[in-house]
C-alpha cells in the first residue's frame, strides 16, 4: 500500500510537525516513534504522561431497547447487567469460539459505546450488523478521533483542561466538554498505567491534542512504545497474541467471561462457539495450548514467531509477542505452549537464530499495573 492510499488520522499534520516517523498500520499512516525514541517515550509514560493517537480504532454506537441483549448474544460477556457509566472488556467470537476481535464497551444509558481494533473495524461492523442489525441500530462514529493519555500524571494534566475527570475511576466513563467540543472520556487504556481514552470530534482533535501537549507532564508517544508498554502489562495484541484460531480459554482470558454467562449461570451460553468455550472452561474439552508469560534468562530479545522447545528439544509452542522490556529491564514475551509446560517456573528454550535461549514461564503482568480504582 503506497502512502497515497494510506488513510490519515485527524492528527496527521501534527505528527509530521513533531517529527514522527510514520509507518503503515491498520491501513493508516501512524507514528511509530517521535525524535525522543521508543525507550524515552516508554519511560516517560511510566513516569509522567504519554499522549497516543489511536484514532485508527473503530468507534460505534449500539442504540435501542434491545441493544444490550443483542450485543450479549455475540460475546461470552455480561452486557445486560453492566451499570450505566461502567466500561467492560469484550470478545467477539466466531461459531468455533475463535476470537474475531477484542474490544471495550461502555453503557452510556442511551446507547452502548463500543471501541474496536483498527485493523478489524470494518469486519467487526459487518459482523455486528449481520448478526444483530435487526435488533438495534448500529451507528459507526467515523467523524470522531480517539486519544489515549496514559501515565501516573495523566489525571493532573487532563484535569486542568477538563475539570471533573478526576472523579472517574478505572473502567468508568462520562461525557465532558472542552471549548464547545463534546468529549466522551473513559478511565482506561492499554499500558498498565492509570490513564484515559478520549473520544473527540475529528475537527477538534488536533486542537485538543495540542492543548494536552502544552501541559508540562505530557509528551507524544508512538506505536513502538505503545507495544512495549502493553506487553509489559501482559495485554494481548489482536493479530499477534489472539486471533480467529484462539479461544478465550486458550488465550487465558477466563477473567473476561463473567459467571452469569458460564455453565450454571443465569444466562449461560447463548454466544457463538459456546459449546466449545464452556467445555474448555469446565475442563471437559482439554486444551491443546495456553497463553503464558515468558522471561528470557539471558539478555537476548525473543521476538514473535520464535519456536519454543523443551530443554530436550521437543517443540511445544511459539512466541507471539516479545521484546526487551524497558521497565522490566529484561527480555519479556508471551506465547502459547502445551498445557503440560504452562506452569509458572517451567524452563523452556526459545530457538533464536538456531541457538537455544533459556526461558522461564512467568506470571503477568511483568510490571505491576497501576490502575486507579478509587
What are these regions (language model features)?
Residues 1-26, 30-34, 107-374:
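Conserved, structured C-terminal
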Residues 1-90, 98, 223:
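Acidic, proline/glycine-enriched N-terminal capping motif
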Residues 65-99, 154-181:
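Internal amphipathic helical hairpin motif
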Amino acid at each position: 500500500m503506497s502512502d497515497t492510499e494510506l488513510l490519515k488520522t485527524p492528527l496527521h499534520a501534527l505528527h509530521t510537525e513533531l517529527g514522527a516517523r510514520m509507518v503503515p498500520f491498520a491501513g493508516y499512516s501512524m507514528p511509530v516513534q517521535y525524535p525522543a525514541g521508543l525507550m524515552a517515550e516508554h519511560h516517560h509514560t511510566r513516569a509522567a504522561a504519554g499522549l497516543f493517537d489511536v484514532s485508527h480504532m473503530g468507534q460505534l454506537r449500539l442504540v435501542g431497547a434491545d441493544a444490550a441483549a443483542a450485543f450479549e448474544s455475540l460475546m461470552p460477556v455480561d452486557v445486560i447487567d453492566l451499570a450505566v457509566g461502567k466500561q467492560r472488556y469484550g470478545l467477539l467470537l466466531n461459531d468455533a469460539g475463535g476470537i474475531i476481535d477484542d474490544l471495550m464497551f461502555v453503557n452510556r444509558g442511551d446507547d452502548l459505546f463500543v471501541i474496536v481494533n483498527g485493523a478489524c473495524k470494518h469486519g467487526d461492523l459487518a459482523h455486528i450488523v449481520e448478526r444483530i442489525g435487526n435488533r438495534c441500530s448500529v451507528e459507526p462514529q467515523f467523524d470522531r478521533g480517539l486519544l489515549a493519555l496514559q501515565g501516573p500524571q495523566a489525571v493532573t494534566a487532563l484535569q486542568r483542561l477538563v475539570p471533573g475527570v478526576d472523579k472517574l475511576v478505572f473502567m468508568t466513563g462520562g461525557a465532558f466538554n472542552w471549548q464547545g467540543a463534546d468529549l466522551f472520556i473513559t478511565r482506561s487504556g492499554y499500558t498498565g498505567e492509570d490513564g484515559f481514552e478520549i473520544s473527540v470530534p475529528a475537527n477538534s482533535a488536533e486542537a485538543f491534542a495540542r492543548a494536552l501537549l502544552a501541559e508540562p507532564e505530557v509528551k507524544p508517544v508512538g506505536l513502538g512504545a505503545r507495544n512495549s508498554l502493553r506487553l509489559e502489562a501482559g495485554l494481548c495484541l489482536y493479530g499477534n497474541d489472539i486471533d480467529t484460531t484462539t479461544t478465550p480459554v486458550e488465550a487465558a482470558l477466563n477473567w473476561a467471561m463473567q459467571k452469569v454467562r458460564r455453565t450454571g449461570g443465569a444466562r449461560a451460553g447463548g454466544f457463538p462457539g459456546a459449546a466449545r468455550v464452556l467445555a474448555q472452561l469446565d475442563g471437559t474439552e482439554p486444551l491443546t495450548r495456553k497463553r503464558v508469560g515468558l522471561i528470557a534468562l539471558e539478555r537476548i530479545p525473543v521476538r514473535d514467531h520464535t519456536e519454543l522447545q523443551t530443554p530436550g528439544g521437543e517443540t511445544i509452542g511459539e512466541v507471539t509477542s516479545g521484546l526487551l522490556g524497558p521497565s522490566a529491564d529484561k527480555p519479556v514475551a508471551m506465547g502459547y505452549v502445551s498445557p503440560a509446560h504452562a506452569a509458572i517456573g517451567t524452563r523452556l528454550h526459545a530457538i533464536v537464530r538456531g541457538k537455544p535461549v533459556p526461558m522461564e514461564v512467568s506470571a503477568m503482568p511483568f510490571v505491576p499495573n497501576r490502575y486507579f480504582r478509587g
